[in-house]
Amino acid sequence: MEDEDDGTLVRRCRDGELKAFDQLVLRYQKPVFNAAFRMLRNPEDARDVAQTVFLKVFEHLEQYDPNLKFYSWIYRITLNESINALGRLRPCEAISGNETDQSPGLEQQVENEQMSRAIEQALMRIQPDHRAVIVLRHFLHLGYQDMGDILELPEKTVKSRLYTARQLLRDVLVEDGVC
């Protein structure tokens, strides 16, 4: 039963099987949390968003189109909820997250940590729609087609938005003296 695909689990959920929903939650709780955390940089806020996402998934499961990929649908909800949460946060709260790096050498670890922190802070200074494409591509390692499905954009628009987002991020990093 654990190897069931998303579509089968969704069908079982729609038939009222709560255990199937539990399996979906187990399957997606880390990816949803990670996506929210990459957008918000705060574990408590990311947990709140993840909780809201699964509540919305449960409440709106009947609206899910089984012809689409389930993970695209849940990531879309996650991004929307993360953007909503960003609107409720003050900028200082949004960049307070702390992520450690597992580099082998201490000096390299410190450098990587400083660069990660600078990138996190720079990401928080660009618009959420631009931040979202960077998170999807570089942190969640999604392809352009999947990104387009999640963002409900054509693939060319995704590529264009990613190019613009990278330029904006680079500009902020240059302005901060990082690059």
Listing of model-derived features with the role each one plays in the protein:
Residues 2-3, 84, 91-116, 143:
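Internal acidic/polar
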Residues 2, 14-23, 33-52, 155, ...:
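Short, charged helix-capping/linker segments at alpha-helix termini
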Residues 72, 79, 83, 130, ...:
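DNA-recognition helix of helix-turn-helix
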Residues 25-43, 60, 123, 168, ...:
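Amphipathic, Lys/Arg- and hydrophobic-enriched alpha-helical face
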Residues 62-66, 76-96, 112, 164:
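Arg/Lys-rich amphipathic alpha helix in sigma70-family domain 2
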Residues 34, 48-55, 68-80:
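Structural recognition of an alpha-helix C-terminal capping motif at a helix-to-coil junction
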Residues 14-15, 38-41, 52-69, 88-89:
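Sigma70-family region 2
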Residues 133-137:
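A short pre-motif secondary-structure segment
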